[in-house]
Amino acid sequence: MGRGRVQLKRIENKINRQVTFSKRRSGLLKKAHEISVLCDAEVGLIVFSTKGKLFEYATDSCMERLLERYERYSFAEKQLVPTDHTSPGSWTLENAKLKARLEVLQRNEKLYVGEDLESLNMKELQNLEHQLASALKHIRSRKNQLMHESISVLQKQDRALQEQNNQLSKKVKEREKEVEQQNQWDQQNHEINSSTFVLPQQLDSPHLGEASQNTNVVDNGEVEGGNSSQXQGAANNTVMPQWMVRHLNG
């Protein structure tokens, strides 16, 4: 004898209702996983308990991608079948969709930081781990790319600064060479301008020299070492230079 059909209505007993929800929820999530694996279908399942707790299942644990695909599909359907967006029913439905998506995003945000992991089974934890590992791989790849780009920019700046330094060093050396040459020219000009021509002294006649050596004049006019006649004779015997003779004759 088979079981009778269970009448579908709200279970009044709170405990029985909670037990039935737990069993049916587990069976529903299991069926969603089975149809996803067996039929290679993308399945998204969202369940809220009476206390507002969220339970979900998504193929490859990517509920956001499924919701975006669903929204694109719904938007395309709405374009084909015009609806009255001003009606209260359409706004209520849109509000419910946005609220559901917001709750999914908030829950995933908690999962990504390691919160509320108690409700996940082994398969869901593995999928979450795979998502985090993939995200970490992309983050590291992007970080390495930015680091290589920064290093490349710094290397270009270093080469530019080195080139500027070489040019400045070359200009400094050229300037020092010019200053050294200018100092040498200034020193040479100073030596030329400060030098004087010394005229040779005219030698006295040998006879005049002998006369000056043999004759010593004193204050009283007397000639020392001989008489006046001898001094006069010595003076008469003095030979005059040619330039003086020409001067006297002229």
UniProtKB/Swiss-Prot annotation:
Domain K-box as annotated: residue spans: 88-178
SUPFAM superfamilies, per the entry: SRF-like (SSF55455)
Keyword Membrane attributed: no
An individual GO BP term: positive regulation of transcription by RNA polymerase II
Sequence ranges assigned to domain MADS-box in this UniProt record: 3-57
GO molecular function: DNA-binding transcription factor activity; protein dimerization activity; RNA polymerase II transcription regulatory region sequence-specific DNA binding
Locations listed in the record: Nucleus
Main location: nucleus
Pfam families from the UniProt entry: K-box, SRF-TF
Gene3D superfamilies: Transcription factor, MADS-box
Bias-annotated ranges (Basic and acidic residues): 171-180
Domain of life: Eukaryota
One of the record's GO cellular component terms: nucleus
Region entry Disordered, spans: 162-191, 206-241
Cited function: Probable transcription factor.
Name listed for the protein in its UniProt record: Agamous-like MADS-box protein AGL8 homolog
Name of encoding gene: SCM1
